[in-house]
């Protein structure tokens, strides 16, 4: 369950920001996560609930934006959002494609603090 280490890292980042900016409490945090990252949403929420106890993030609302899977065609230049990884370009049919998005693991985007 790598979600524990991901949440631990996010909480460390929050503590670093708190040391710099002097805030006492996190009300809300927004993360982004690629659809192909392998992060389990339920496990992530559970890990956050457990690991944030007795920290300035305890009770904070956790929002997660999922980033779409995007393939980029090297022939026609189109970047296309897809539901699953495709081996060919939906626009021109070329198999000369690269995975261009959706693999990002986890990123802290926004904090609402007091």
Curated annotation (Swiss-Prot):
Gene3D superfamilies membership: 3.30.2320.80
Binding site for Zn(2+): 73, 76, 89, 92
Pfam families to which the protein is assigned, alphabetical: HypA
InterPro entries: Hydgase_Ni_incorp_HypA/HybF_CS, HypA/HybF
Entry annotated with the keyword Metal-binding: yes
A GO MF label: zinc ion binding
Residues the entry annotates as binding Ni(2+): 2
Keywords associated with the record: Metal-binding, Nickel, Zinc
GO biological process, one term: protein modification process
Function according to Swiss-Prot or TrEMBL: Involved in the maturation of [NiFe] hydrogenases. Required for nickel insertion into the metal center of the hydrogenase.
Family: Belongs to the HypA/HybF family.
UniProt name for this protein: Hydrogenase maturation factor HypA
Taxonomic source organism: Syntrophus aciditrophicus (strain SB)
Gene: hypA
